């Protein structure tokens, strides 16, 4: 009878003792660039004197687009312009709204006094 021989290869220590290699991935944190879209939308809807709110809204959208593309410098430039326009829109909007209300009140009081004088003259006082 013929015997077959089987060879067993020795592979070394078990794989659990081999240390795995580590890979380091550097993820750059995005610089937070506020685009002021909500503030611009508020100024557009409620304080849009001289169309500054609408222009600020356009710059805010451009800032958001630049941020989505990855152009942080361009996004910051558009955001800075939008912020400046929003400040001016807010200041002018508040001042012109107060001025309009004062003009309306004083105009109404003046018309009331003129009408009162006309009524008194017709009655013969």
From Swiss-Prot:
The keyword Lipoprotein applies. A lipid is attached at residues 50-51, 84 (S-palmitoyl cysteine). Keywords: Antiviral defense, Cell membrane, Immunity, Innate immunity, Lipoprotein, Lysosome, Membrane, Osteogenesis, Palmitate, Phosphoprotein, Transmembrane, Transmembrane helix. Palmitoylation on membrane-proximal cysteines controls clustering in membrane compartments and antiviral activity. The keyword Phosphoprotein applies. InterPro entries: CD225/Dispanin_fam (IPR007593), IFITM_antiviral_protein (IPR051517). Disulfide bonds: none annotated. Residues 84-125 are annotated as: Interaction with CAV1. It is a single-pass membrane protein. IFN-induced antiviral protein which inhibits the entry of viruses to the host cell cytoplasm, permitting endocytosis, but preventing subsequent viral fusion and release of viral contents into the cytosol. Active against multiple viruses, including influenza A virus, SARS coronaviruses (SARS-CoV and SARS-CoV-2), Marburg virus (MARV), Ebola virus (EBOV), Dengue virus (DNV), West Nile virus (WNV), human immunodeficiency virus type 1 (HIV-1) and hepatitis C virus (HCV). Interacts with CD81. Part of a complex composed of CD19, CR2/CD21, CD81 and IFITM1/CD225 in the membrane of mature B-cells. Interacts with CAV1; this interaction enhances the ability of CAV1 in inhibiting ERK activation. This is Interferon-induced transmembrane protein 1. It comes from Homo sapiens. The lineage of its organism: Eukaryota, Metazoa, Chordata, Craniata, Vertebrata.
């Amino acid at each position: 009878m013929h015997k077959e021989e089987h060879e067993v290869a020795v592979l070394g220590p078990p794989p659990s003792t081999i240390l795995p290699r580590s890979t380091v991935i550097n993820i750059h944190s995005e610089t937070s660039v506020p685009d002021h879209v909500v503030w611009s939308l508020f100024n557009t809807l409620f304080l849009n004197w001289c169309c500054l709110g609408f222009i600020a809204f356009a710059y805010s959208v451009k800032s958001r687009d630049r941020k989505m593309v990855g152009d942080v410098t361009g996004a910051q430039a558009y955001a800075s312009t939008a912020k400046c326009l929003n400040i001016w829109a807010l200041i002018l909007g508040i001042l012109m709204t107060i001025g309009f209300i004062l003009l309306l009140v004083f105009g109404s009081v003046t018309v009331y006094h003129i009408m009162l004088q006309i009524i008194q003259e017709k009655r013969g006082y």
